[in-house]
Design a protein with these regions (language model features):
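Hydrophobic targeting segments
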Residues: 2-7, 30, 45-48
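Conserved core of the sugar-phosphate nucleotidyltransferase
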Residues: 80-83, 87, 106-187
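Conserved SAM-binding loop
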Residues: 6, 22-23, 48, 100
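A short, N-terminal amphipathic alpha-helix
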Residues: 29-44, 57-61
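Short phosphate-binding loop-to-helix
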Residues: 47, 53-99, 107-115
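Short beta-strand/turn micro-motifs composed of small residues
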Residues: 9, 50-51, 102, 129
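N-terminal nucleotide-binding beta1-loop-alpha1 segment
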Residues: 1-17
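Short active-site oxyanion
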Residues: 42-47, 124
Length: 187
């Protein structure tokens, strides 16, 4: 079963130029993701998808492969990660499983990826998640005049310990069947 890791690392970030190779604790931030993927032993190939030669060179120096330069059609601010992963899968001749790993996830570990690979034995996807510290059911919204109101009015008087836990994408990775990425299914 061919399993690949795909690390999208576009060079054209508007907020932080070349953020994927900015130093973080002494090395380019992207290298933490590459090292975790390589050290996990889970992947047949760890691929960085980029449009930037400096990022490609840093990825290669870190042990990842850069078998292609991402086409301009997949490099603007409005392209999501699923088409980028699908392109990588196709560019390397297919895969059975693919793991999208964010380049800006310095706290990802090889153990996280091993556990996710194990979870795929029983599930279609494995996703890194984190719990919200405060109950989201107490969330507020603000209108254009600056007035706030409850999003879930039915929970205004509910004790916080009686509210269900809620989770969010921790932005480390999403691991699943390659076919789901190719079919552009929601992850």
């Amino acid at each position: 079963m061919k399993t690949i890791a795909v690390i999208p690392a576009r060079g054209g970030s508007k907020r932080i130029e070349r953020k994927n190779i900015r130093p973080f604790c002494g090395k380019p931030i992207m290298l933490y993701s590459i090292e975790a993927a390589l050290n996990s032993g889970v992947f047949d190939d760890v691929i960085v998808s980029t449009d930037d030669e400096a990022i490609a060179n840093a990825a290669r120096a870190g042990g990842a492969s850069v078998p292609f330069i991402r086409p301009p059609s997949l490099c603007d601010d409005f392209v999501g990660v699923v088409p980028v992963v699908a392109h990588a899968i196709e560019a390397v001749g297919g895969a059975d499983r693919a793991c999208l790993i964010y380049a800006t996830a310095p706290f990802i570990s090889s153990d996280d990826l091993k556990q996710a690979a194990q979870a795929l034995c029983e599930n279609d996807f494995a996703l890194s998640i984190a719990a919200y510290e405060a109950p989201i059911f107490r969330a507020l919204t603000m209108d254009e005049r600056g007035f706030v109101s409850s999003i879930w009015r039915e929970h205004e008087q509910t004790r916080s310990q009686d509210l269900p836990a809620a989770f969010h994408d921790a932005a480390h990775f999403c691991f699943g069947r390659a076919s789901a990425f190719l079919e552009n299914k929601s992850i």
